[in-house]
């Protein structure tokens, strides 16, 4: 019996010793109370934060919203900040997005940086113009089988000062979404039923943040328009998780609330006189529409512009009336559609095939100087890769190839 008591006593003593060691180490490694984060050397911009918080979250808590399309997961590489002091060693998770030269200069991913001491960081001045809005859903309608147009109303008296090609981030609270509750019009339900998509559910326990490009242009004021493709699991494995954010967005109905922040962006048009060639597919339509409307309606440019859009079938086409109208109004604008899998009921007499092949065969191969054009593209990853490869073969330099990774 004495041996048992001694054993229990020794065990308790060891546990207490370990606890004391951990508490001592924590007291040395993590400061108590708040720490100060100096920003751009401006005392008025300095904030305080709790040790152990991530830098991205601490900035957001103080109303400074750094772009993070993945919501802080470390996968998008957008939440870059320059840390001049107090950031510690760069983590392996950051090195996929930050070069050795950039790391040496202090570049870090704010979602991966844990606050341990006072810090000194630098942020672009435009970040301080980023705000958050609680919007109301005006409509959420199918534009194609798997693409909805979400239209949000900005609060009265407010505006989102975005540029064409820009994007916002939208927040989704924890939720449980059942695909059977989605409002899918009869003309699109066939594929949904055939693939068993109405049986899918998406249950998310944490807040989610994702980025979406605007489909409207700056003069369409008071609203934000997004094209959102539902990220369903592949039909041959419906047990895989559905897209967290797209499932949430597809569940939104008129009158619902949605929180956005922004504006953000890098996918902006160059201020030159060069010919502009836009190439899109799928939900990559969004920034294409924003850019083209902005060029022709707001800027009233006389630059030569063409738009090449690829869809599977006629049922997957949208904004046709918009682009037909722009083409009629502007002699310097032409737009073209290619269907990769036209259906018998389409009675399609237009171009067929993948859009990069159609663009090459019907325009670029006979173009006197494709290398002098500016190419703006947004679509599915395979489309983007094929277009870039084709442009490289034509001698187009990187500086004339602009890619939006979010719209597809």
Swiss-Prot record:
GO terms assigned for molecular function: 2 iron, 2 sulfur cluster binding; electron transfer activity; metal ion binding; oxidoreductase activity, acting on NAD(P)H, quinone or similar compound as acceptor
Named cofactor requirement(s): [2Fe-2S] cluster; FAD
Membrane topology: Single-pass membrane protein
Catalytic activity: a ubiquinone + n Na(+)(in) + NADH + H(+) = a ubiquinol + n Na(+)(out) + NAD(+)
Keywords for this protein: 2Fe-2S, Cell inner membrane, Cell membrane, FAD, Flavoprotein, Ion transport, Iron, Iron-sulfur, Membrane, Metal-binding, NAD, Sodium, Sodium transport, Translocase, Transmembrane, Transmembrane helix, Transport, Ubiquinone
One cellular component term from this protein's GO annotations in UniProt: plasma membrane
UniProt keyword Ion transport present: yes
Keyword Ion transport attached: yes
Places the protein is found: Cell inner membrane
FAD-binding FR-type domain: residues covered: 130-270
Coiled coil: none
GO biological process: sodium ion transport
Cofactor binding notes: Binds 1 [2Fe-2S] cluster.
Principal location class: membrane
Subunit note: Composed of six subunits; NqrA, NqrB, NqrC, NqrD, NqrE and NqrF.
Function comment: NQR complex catalyzes the reduction of ubiquinone-1 to ubiquinol by two successive reactions, coupled with the transport of Na(+) ions from the cytoplasm to the periplasm. The first step is catalyzed by NqrF, which accepts electrons from NADH and reduces ubiquinone-1 to ubisemiquinone by a one-electron transfer pathway.
Family: Belongs to the NqrF family.
Protein name: Na(+)-translocating NADH-quinone reductase subunit F
Species annotation: Pseudoalteromonas atlantica (strain T6c / ATCC BAA-1087)
């Amino acid at each position: 019996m004495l041996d048992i008591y001694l054993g229990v006593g020794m065990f308790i003593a060891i546990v207490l010793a370990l606890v004391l060691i951990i508490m001592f180490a924590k007291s040395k490694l993590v400061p108590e109370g708040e720490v100060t984060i100096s920003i751009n050397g401006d005392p008025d911009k300095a904030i305080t934060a709790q040790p152990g918080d991530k830098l991205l979250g601490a900035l957001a808590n103080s109303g400074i919203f750094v772009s993070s399309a993945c919501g802080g997961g470390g996968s998008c590489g957008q939440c870059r900040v320059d840390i001049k002091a107090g950031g510690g060693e760069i983590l392996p998770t950051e090195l996929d997005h930050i070069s050795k030269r950039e790391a040496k200069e202090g570049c870090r991913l704010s979602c991966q940086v844990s606050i341990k001491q006072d810090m000194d960081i630098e942020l672009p001045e435009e970040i301080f113009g980023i705000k958050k809005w609680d919007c109301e859903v005006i409509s959420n309608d199918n534009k194609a089988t798997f693409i909805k147009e979400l239209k949000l109303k900005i609060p009265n008296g407010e505006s989102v000062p975005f540029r064409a090609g820009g994007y916002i981030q939208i927040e989704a609270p924890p939720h449980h979404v059942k695909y059977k509750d989605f409002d899918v019009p009869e003309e699109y339900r066939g594929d949904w039923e055939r693939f068993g998509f109405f049986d899918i559910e998406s249950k998310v326990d944490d807040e989610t943040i994702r980025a979406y490009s605007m489909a409207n242009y700056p003069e369409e004021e008071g609203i934000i328009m997004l094209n959102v493709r539902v990220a369903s699991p592949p039909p041959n494995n419906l047990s895989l998780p559905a897209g967290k954010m797209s499932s949430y967005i597809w569940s939104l109905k008129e009158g619902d609330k949605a929180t956005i922040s922004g504006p953000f962006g890098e996918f902006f048009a160059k201020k030159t006189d060069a010919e502009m060639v836009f190439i899109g597919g799928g939900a990559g339509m969004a920034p294409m529409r924003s850019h083209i409307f902005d060029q022709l309606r707001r800027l009233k440019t006389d630059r030569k512009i063409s738009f090449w859009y690829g869809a599977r079938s006629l049922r997957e086409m949208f904004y046709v009336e918009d682009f037909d109208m722009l083409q009629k109004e502007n002699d310097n604008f032409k737009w073209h559609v290619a269907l990769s899998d036209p259906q018998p009921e389409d009675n399609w007499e237009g171009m067929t095939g993948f859009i990069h092949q159609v663009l090459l065969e019907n325009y670029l191969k006979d173009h006197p100087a494709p290398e002098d054009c500016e190419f703006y593209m947004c679509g599915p990853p395979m489309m983007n890769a094929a277009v870039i490869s084709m442009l490289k073969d034509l001698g187009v330099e990187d500086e004339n190839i602009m890619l939006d990774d979010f719209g597809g």
